[in-house]
Amino acid sequence: MKLKSFGVFGNPIKHSKSPLIHNACFLTFQKKLGFLGHYHPILLPLESHIKNEFLHLGLSGANVTLPFKERAFQICDKIKGIALECGAVNTLVLENDELVGYNTDALGFYLSLKQKNYQNALILGSGGSAKALACELKKQGLEVSVLNRSARGLDFFQRLGCDCFMEPPKSAFDLIINATSASLNNELPLNKEVLKGYFKEGQLAYDLAYGFLTPFLSLAKELEIPFQDGKDMLIYQAALSFEKFSASQIPYSKAFEVMRSVF
């Protein structure tokens, strides 16, 4: 049986559960796919050229995580779907010798929400994940605000119709989303007292990090407000990516079931 290689580019990458859940799917569906896929974690030096690495490693597809999602958008031969709007790519697929970029973070995040009746959201951070979330939430009719410590990237959100801030706005928000990398450094993304104020008036604290109780989620738990980590988003975006890797032979719902069973 033919072997195909896949992977996930990131820095850091050792925390990623993507190899676990994708390899479970490649094993489960190998007969239907007609090939055996193997999915590797790939630690990419910050200065690396993603496309060169992808081709050098002979990959058929890959996911892209922190901090490469915006750079991945720039190196694709073709961009499809909502990735065109959000300027960030988390899924790369070799299609007819062209490197095609997709974004499954956007829909993956929305599918992971247990309820869908939020009116507005505050996104902390302005990177590739934040862009994907803002695009999807705007598409779903929410008012979106973005708070970032610097002006970097905020022009994108302004063009999207988001309210942008470099200082914490004095407003209440239903959804407070941590899309920064602070949790990976075991830090809060924002001043503790300011965050407490948002949590006390909010309906859900959501951290894109997964696998441990982050300082962000720990504070929400302490204040007894609903909170959610990024585990379900990871599985949904991975299942949507797997559908692309399988050339749509395996619907994301089937991939999700397998991935959920192992993680």
From Swiss-Prot:
Taxonomic lineage: Bacteria, Pseudomonadati, Campylobacterota, Epsilonproteobacteria, Campylobacterales
Designated name of the protein: Shikimate dehydrogenase (NADP(+))
Residues involved in NADP(+) binding: 125-129, 208, 230
Pathway annotation from the record: Metabolic intermediate biosynthesis; chorismate biosynthesis; chorismate from D-erythrose 4-phosphate and phosphoenolpyruvate: step 4/7
Entry EC number(s): 1.1.1.25
Entries under PANTHER family matching the protein: BIFUNCTIONAL 3-DEHYDROQUINATE DEHYDRATASE_SHIKIMATE DEHYDROGENASE, CHLOROPLASTIC, SHIKIMATE DEHYDROGENASE
Positions that bind shikimate: 16-18, 65, 90, 105, 210
Subunit architecture: Homodimer.
Domain of life: Bacteria
Claim: NADP is one of the keywords in the record: yes
MF terms in GO: NADP binding; shikimate 3-dehydrogenase (NADP+) activity
Any one of the GO BP annotations: amino acid biosynthetic process
